[in-house]
Amino acid sequence: DVADMMADSMADMGAYIVLAFAAAHFIAMFEWSNLGSIIAISGADLLQSVGFTGLPLLFSFILVSALINLFVGSASAKWAIMAPVFVPMLMLAGEPGYSPETVQAAYRIGDSFTNILTPLLPYFPLVIIFAQRYDEDAGIGSIIALMVPYSVSFGVVSILVFLVWVLLGLPLGPGAELYYGG
């Protein structure tokens, strides 16, 4: 009986195992080919050649992070995809380049203020259930429409605080400088 129950439960895992295998294969090939390094170095060279560095670069990275957040729900999955390319790219783009801590702080800002706007947020169904306590017609569209002003306000304030922080040259924490190399 136990063996049959275990076999039945593993039958449901087949699609996940195949997906995990494909994802692991993609990650291994990405690492083996050094494609992340090639994209990062080429991207940094391109950014420097067109003079796109400094605060506009950080601001753009925040917006890219926010845009990707609308389509990829997991923060750790987004960081796993973005970090191998963007951390070295922003470290190399500009003199001095941004430290990994600064890049991650910018990523977290972009990731944070669009969370409530994506239906991929794991807690979105819970938000809808709570909203329907007060408005039975509340749904995905009405929740997103209601949250846009809050999200935009939170995003603008967060970005401004971060950019002022960078302009003042304040460290992000003990031993966490803004720029690569201190």
Please annotate each region the language model reported.
Residues 20-28, 58-69, 150-167:
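Hydrophobic core segments of alpha-helical transmembrane domains in multi-pass membrane transport
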Residues 20-24, 48-89, 101-104:
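Hydrophobic alpha-helical transmembrane segments of multi-pass integral membrane proteins
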Residues 28-37, 68-81, 114-122:
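Short helix-coil transition sites and intra-membrane helix breaks within transmembrane domains
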Residues 9-13, 17, 46, 50, ...:
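Loop-to-transmembrane-helix entry motif
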Residues 38-41, 76-91, 121-134:
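Re-entrant/interfacial helical elements at transmembrane boundaries that shape
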